[in-house]
Amino acid sequence: MQRIMAKKNIFTDAFGTPYFLKRMVIFILGMVSYRRFNGFNKLKISGSENLINLPDTNVLFVSNHQTYFADVAAMYHAFCAVNNGYMNTIKNPVYLLNPKVDFYYVAAEETMNKGILARIFKIAGAVTVKRTWRSEGKNVNRMVDMNEVDNIMKALDNGWVITFPQGTTSAFAQGRKGTAKLIKKQRPIVIPIKINGFRRAFDKKGLKIKVTGVQPTMEFKKPLDIDYDNESPQEILEKVMYAIEQTDEFNLLHEYDNELKNKNNSQ
């Protein structure tokens, strides 16, 4: 059965949130968080040129994940800055007056339903999903809710979407094949994002500053070259995980473990 694409509305986003409310929330959250990225700590952005001339819809950003909220907040700053012609910098927060509103991010439902601040973040563009492998700190095994997949595709039909293919803030966790299946089906332009330093600068939620003087980094890479017809979801996933530098070859501890094993085997 053919999927019906959601029609654009000049007053609301893909899920009915009024644009004026979304603009207000992005502006307030942006001003509150600004000093975290250009004051107490200095966010270093690179690769903004890879965001120029992208289409307004069906662009999927895939990123590693280090905190619940600081990662996404920093990305909002970067996208809004580029939307107003500021490349690789967030030094002039005037860009918050003209934010990119057709912008969404995939987030765990349980995270976005905890506390008033999480609910405010949700208004800014969260597309919530129930994790199939983890819930309330316990391992689970449940089926994917296809309505949630449809919501992500609806968001892509209407704008840009960020997803975190590992589904966790743990470094070098395995990628989830659902992201690759979505890519193969929806055929978006896929832009990898590599972030670093957020885990050191902020607490796990990304709300409290742990250390000042840190320079978190955010690198926007070139679009992935994907053969949507012939590459399998597993091949696409491997390409995504390598691009966001979450495979074993980027894990220094993994290399160290291998060196120890080789040393022990040779003795």
Regions found by a protein language model. Name each.
Residues 2-46, 74, 115-124:
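A transmembrane-helix-recognition feature enriched in membrane-embedded lipid enzymes
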Residues 21-22, 35-42, 106, 137-143, ...:
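Short, flexible loop segments at the rims of nucleotide/cofactor-binding pockets, characterized by
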Residues 33-66, 76:
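Helix-to-loop junction immediately C-terminal to a conserved catalytic motif
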Residues 44-47, 113, 145-149, 175-179:
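Amphipathic coiled-coil/heptad-repeat helices and related helical stalk/stem segments
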Residues 55-140:
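Catalytic core of membrane glycerolipid acyltransferases/transacylases, capturing the structured
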Residues 127-172:
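Internal catalytic-core helix/loop-beta-alpha segment
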Residues 157-162, 167-235:
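A cross-family acyltransferase "interaction/gating" segment
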Residues 254-267:
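Short, highly charged C-terminal tails/helix-capping segments
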